[in-house]
A protein has these predicted regions:
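Extended recognition/assembly regions associated with phosphoester-bond processing machinery
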Residues: 1-78, 82-214
């Protein structure tokens, strides 16, 4: 895995964007990401659609590399940790997570996070709510116009279309505006929305090896 980074300053705080679909907040020592959709592959297999199990394994391997690199004290998921409740993929995720018991685990719930009391205990969550506020930043799955503070959000799975001489290329991105930082979906097993993006923003587009502002 090639890790490329680019710093951006928001409200006098340094955030590190990565080409591996995650964000690091230096001051808070927090690794931040959105839309893992754990359980999506198992859900499809259960419904008769054959998918390789390596999809989620690859996501977790990337996450492990990010944890080893940044050494976070907090792990913040800005919604859609899960895709379809409890299944075998969730068991695998919990086994993976147990090796990082020293990291506090914060879940901002998304529209897919249907979590029972039993599943809350299984996931060993340190925090679970619809919003998380740290200093002047609010973490919420989907942008909320009623919130005055700067919002860090997910949900959209943002992407951008670039035109080359041969074809159009769709790439994931971060989008930063005056009051929002929109995160890409962490899982690679997701689509891209290239239309419903915040207006007037800066786009940080990335590939497997690079990240650039455009």
């Amino acid at each position: 895995m090639n890790l490329a980074t680019k710093n951006t300053t928001i409200q006098n705080e340094i955030f590190t964007l990565t080409n591996q679909r995650a964000l690091f907040w230096k001051k808070e020592k927090a690794l931040i990401l959105s839309d893992l959709h754990i359980g999506k592959t198992a859900h499809f297999r259960k419904n008769g659609i054959a998918l390789a199990n390596h999809i989620m394994k690859n996501d977790l391997e990337r996450l492990s590399i990010l944890i080893e690199y940044f050494k976070p004290e907090k792990f913040i998921v800005v919604g859609d940790l899960l895709h379809a409740g409890d299944n075998s993929d969730v068991d695998e995720f919990c086994t993976w997570k147990n090796q990082y018991s020293n990291i506090k685990f914060y879940l901002v719930e998304g529209n897919h996070d249907r979590i029972s009391k039993t599943l809350v205990q299984k996931l060993c969550l340190d925090f679970r709510a619809n919003q998380l506020k740290i200093n002047d930043f609010v973490f919420v799955h989907d942008f909320d116009k009623s919130i005055e503070d700067f919002q860090i959000t997910g949900h959209i799975h943002p992407g951008i279309v670039l035109n080359s001489a041969v074809k159009k290329i769709r790439l994931p991105c971060f989008v930063q505006t005056e009051n929002q930082l929109l995160l890409p979906a962490f899982s690679e097993f997701t689509g891209l929305d290239t239309k419903n993006l915040p207006k007037g923003g800066r786009f940080y587009v990335f590939t497997d090896s690079e990240i650039h502002e455009i």
